[in-house]
Amino acid sequence: GHSAYIISTILARHGFSKSFHIFDSFEGGLSDKTSEDVSDYARQTKEEAEFEKNWFSSTINDLKKALIGFDFIEIYKGWIPDRFPEVESKKFAFVHVDVDLYQPTLDSLKFFYPRLLPGGVIVVDDYGYSVFPGAKRAVDEFLRGTDCSVFYETPMGSCFIIK
């Protein structure tokens, strides 16, 4: 919800009039890690995994409350990529992927990049974070088969993919 609030605030200040689509399970989600998501030094106890899942979850009502007043937001509750068909016919100028894990990151890139307008930007929030190695693996795998105009890794761990 923090990223959605920051992005919404910036968009509102600049007179944004398009739709801002937010996809979230509202169930945490770090419990569905695969071998692609585990770093060698980030092994967890069951208690640590449960804490992590709860740390990254919020309710849809909490999000709606935080984003009240931003009438351009559309929220899709569900798992990635299950809800993507609802926006299959749309084009996107900006996509912010903050899903931490390999498979939903890869699914997001495969779905949104072909629908990205020329010059459009995809930001992958967790690309450079060692605790989320799956995000980097997904981006690197995706880029091997994609001709993007620009790829830029920020010093803060995100990356930008520009079509």
What are these regions (language model features)?
Residues 1-163:
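S-adenosylmethionine/decaboxylated-SAM
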